């Protein structure tokens, strides 16, 4: 699914008739997190990064895969040249956070909740480790330490979410927001997005993501030594 989503993002980014992208999900919940099924089909897709070594054994192969399909793809999506809006409802768990965090704006329904419980698996959190930037430092620690969730209203108060609306109004509100943005000059939007992203990068965002990814790989390696499996 990640490569299919990447293909859709690429098509939209290159289509001049597309002004704003909306990432939405069908059903009562936005995302239950990572698909932990077999990744052996990764070689069927065109890699976006240059890590290679996907078939190598042990930590080397696992890091290559996760640098590609998680951190690599998320970083591409975060830097798309057009405005992106995540439209979320219900539960947003673990990998679901990575999908919405790469978007420029987040509109949530009143029933939305957000969590990353993967410390329970013996690692630090999801691979696109933007927790401190999205939740704030102390709230990020609480969420990771406890495995708990925060509500849409709490996410709004800490600046992670832009708007909270009734569930029945979610799509209409998001479409209206996208329409409003689409009327702005595309060059101005592109430059505004790039400027804000670069301000974040100047504060060390990309370095923090890379460091957290390395620590996550340490957690996986420890699990393999202690428990015989990468995820405890």
Feature roles, as predicted:
Residues 25-72:
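Glycine- (often His-adjacent) and acidic-residue-rich active-site loop
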Residues 75-187:
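Crotonase-fold acyl-CoA enzyme core
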């Amino acid at each position: 699914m990640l490569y299919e989503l990447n293909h859709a993002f690429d098509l939209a980014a290159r289509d001049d008739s597309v002004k704003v992208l909306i990432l939405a999900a069908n059903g009562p919940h936005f995302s239950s997190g990572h698909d932990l099924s077999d990744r052996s089909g990764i070689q069927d897709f065109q890699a976006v990064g240059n890590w290679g070594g996907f078939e190598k054994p042990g930590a080397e192969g696992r890091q290559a895969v996760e640098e590609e399909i998680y951190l690599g793809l998320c970083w591409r999506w975060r830097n798309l040249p057009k405005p992106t809006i995540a439209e979320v409802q219900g539960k947003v768990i673990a990998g679901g956070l990575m999908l919405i965090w790469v978007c420029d704006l987040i509109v949530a329904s009143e029933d939305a909740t957000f969590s990353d419980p993967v410390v329970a698996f013996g690692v630090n959190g999801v691979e696109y480790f933007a927790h401190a930037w999205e939740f704030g430092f102390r709230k990020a620690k609480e969420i990771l330490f406890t495995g708990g969730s925060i509500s849409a209203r709490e996410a709004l108060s800490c600046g992670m979410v832009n708007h909270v609306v009734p569930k029945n109004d979610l799509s209409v509100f998001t479409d209206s927001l996208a329409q409003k943005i689409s009327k702005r000059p595309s060059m101005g939007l592109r430059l505004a997005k790039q400027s804000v992203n670069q301000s974040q990068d100047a504060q060390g965002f990309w370095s923090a993501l890379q460091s957290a990814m390395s620590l996550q790989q340490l957690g996986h390696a420890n699990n393999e030594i202690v428990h015989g499996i990468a995820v405890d």
